[in-house]
Structures are given as C-alpha cells and as structure tokens.
C-alpha cells in the first residue's frame, strides 16, 4: 500500500464541508450526521445505497457455516448473519489507481457489466 496512512474521521468530514461549502461548523456537522444516518437507515432496512461515481453499499446475507479455531483446530459453527459490503465504482477504481478517466482496461469493463 502506498497511501498516506491517514484515517479520515467524522470531524474531518465536517471540517471539509465547513471549508468547501461554507456552512457553519454546527450546520456542517449536522449535515454530515444526517447523510450518515440516512445511509445507515437504508442499509439497516436491507436497501442498497448507490452513490454515482463513488460506489455501492449493500447488505448481503451469509449462511451458517463451519469454521475452525486456528489455535486448537476445533470446528466451530458460525451463525448466519448479515454483512455490509462496499463495491467501488469503476471511476473510483481508476482514481485510486491513478488512471485517467475513460481509460478502463477490459478487465475493469467486465467488472462493471
């Protein structure tokens, strides 16, 4: 990984909204919290949240399966559960990989179909 290692927090997002949109700090914080709550509420209901040019958050159901304790080797049942997954858009993948817009490889195009 060649990232900077910085973790962006809610406070960082609120500050970015404050700096770039021009809302007060209180309004910026309320705005960020509202957006995050709406995304959370949708996911909790099992809805997919698709953000154009960014990606999709979705909830998937995982069935029961047998796992193994790595220390003892004992089989352990893993209960069925719901997990949240994020699938980045092709545009986000390109930006992360430093590619210019519109220069998708064949493998990237196959993933978006």
UniProtKB/Swiss-Prot annotation:
Top-rank taxon, per record: Bacteria
UniProt GO cellular component terms: cytosol
Presence of the UniProt keyword Cell division in the record: no
Single GO BP term: regulation of translation
Keywords for this protein: DNA recombination, DNA-binding, Transcription, Transcription regulation, Translation regulation
GO molecular function, one term: DNA binding
Pfam families in the cross-refs: Bac_DNA_binding
Function per UniProt: This protein is one of the two subunits of integration host factor, a specific DNA-binding protein that functions in genetic recombination as well as in transcriptional and translational control.
PANTHER family in UniProt: DNA-BINDING PROTEIN HU (PTHR33175), INTEGRATION HOST FACTOR SUBUNIT ALPHA (PTHR33175:SF2)
Cited HAMAP family: IHF_alpha
Assembly information from the UniProt record: Heterodimer of an alpha and a beta chain.
Sequence similarity: Belongs to the bacterial histone-like protein family.
The name this protein goes by in its record: Integration host factor subunit alpha
Gene name of the record: ihfA
């Amino acid at each position: 990984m060649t990232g900077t290692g910085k973790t962006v927090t809610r406070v960082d997002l609120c500050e970015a909204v404050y700096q770039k949109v021009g809302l007060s700090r209180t309004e910026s914080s309320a705005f960020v919290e509202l957006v995050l709550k709406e995304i959370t509420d949708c996911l909790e209901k099992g809805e997919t949240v698709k953000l154009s040019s960014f990606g999709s958050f979705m909830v998937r159901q995982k069935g029961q399966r047998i796992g193994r304790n790595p220390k003892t080797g004992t089989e352990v049942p893993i209960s069925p559960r719901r997990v949240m997954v994020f699938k980045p858009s092709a545009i986000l993948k390109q930006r992360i990989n430093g590619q210019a817009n519109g220069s998708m490889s064949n493998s990237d195009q196959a993933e978006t179909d």
